[in-house]
Regions:
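Hydrophobic transmembrane alpha-helices that form the core helical bundles
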Residues: 29, 41, 50-128, 132-136, ...
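Juxtamembrane helix-boundary/capping and inter-helix hinge elements in multi-pass membrane proteins
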Residues: 33-36, 63-68, 76-82, 215-223, ...
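TM-loop-TM module centered on a large, flexible mid-protein loop between adjacent transmembrane helices
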Residues: 71-73, 79, 112, 229-281
């Protein structure tokens, strides 16, 4: 079979599974809880995930025909029981917690913006069915769709983040971050920063999902690790820019405890009014 996926598609796979509404909620919560200090655990977790990426790339090089990721690697190295536990913890539980939250939030946002009379559960099911159909057409069609979606998502997040960082939005809604910024002691020092590493981890989880499609890459020896590295660095900078922008237009207490549970939507509304709300939605 002809290998069809290049480096760009590999990066899109790494990033596309992470850049999502649930991650924006986690970003807003982290920034609201400890302010811009949240960028420090964000960076530390990015480095940790890079080491994880190196491990997966090495395992893929040793066993290039293995397609099952964590479960198959554990099966070869430690036996069936660790493999079962690894599959449950790395994929099943993670997908249940993250993807259900993501598809639910997507349905809620679309209902609030465009379809107020439609049940959000119906919207979520339709979106899930749409992606199921796209996947049934094969990895080539899936990669083309994902490349376009990821490019638009990243570009949109960078732009709306830069508008916030440069304070180019609605001037009356600008928040004086410096006046309310927590000090290092107020966030609990180094221990406090470490406690937010778990929250920051959700902003990078899933970059290793490129492993199951490594067989379809044109140059897997080069592109597996390079895709994960570029994806992690790209995510760190995009999320840092967007997080700083959030703190310029939304107070920290609202970011941390947004009444609607969507701090990114509050930020977009404060930044550009209803146009920002539609844009972020």
């Amino acid at each position: 079979m002809k290998k069809k996926l290049g480096l760009g598609s590999g990066v899109a796979i790494c990033v596309g599974l992470i850049v999502a509404t649930s991650c924006l909620v986690s970003l807003g919560t982290g920034m609201g809880s400890i302010g811009r200090w949240f960028i420090i655990p964000l960076f530390a977790v990015m480095v940790l995930n890079w080491f994880i990426g190196i491990s997966f790339a090495e395992l893929n090089g040793l066993m290039p025909r293995v397609q099952g990721g964590t479960g198959q690697y554990l099966l070869a190295g430690m036996g069936p029981l660790p493999s079962l536990i690894g599959n449950l913890s790395a994929y099943v539980i993670t997908e249940i917690l993250s993807m259900t939250a993501e598809i639910t939030l997507c349905g809620l946002v679309l209902k609030g913006l465009f379809l107020p009379h439609v049940d959000n559960r119906i919207i979520s099911i339709i979106i899930m069915a749409l992606f199921l159909v796209i996947n049934l057409f094969g990895v080539d069609i899936f990669s083309k769709v994902q490349n376009i979606v990821v490019f638009l998502l990243i570009g949109s997040m960078v732009l709306i983040g830069l508008i916030g960082v440069c304070k180019l939005g609605i001037s009356s809604n600008v928040v004086d971050y410096a006046a309310n910024a927590p000090t290092f002691e107020q966030i609990g020092g180094f221990k406090g920063l470490c406690s937010y590493a778990a929250l920051a981890f959700w902003l990078f989880i899933g970059v290793e999902f490129i492993i199951p499609v490594a067989k379809d890459l044109k140059n897997p020896r080069r592109d597996v690790l390079l895709s994960m590295t570029i994806g992690l660095v790209l995510l760190f900078f995009v999320q840092s820019i967007l997080g700083i922008g959030m703190t310029n237009y939304v107070s920290l207490d609202i970011l941390a405890n947004d009444p609607a549970g969507t701090p990114h939507m509050t930020y977009a509304t404060n930044l550009l009014g209803n146009a920002g709300r539609i844009w972020m939605g």
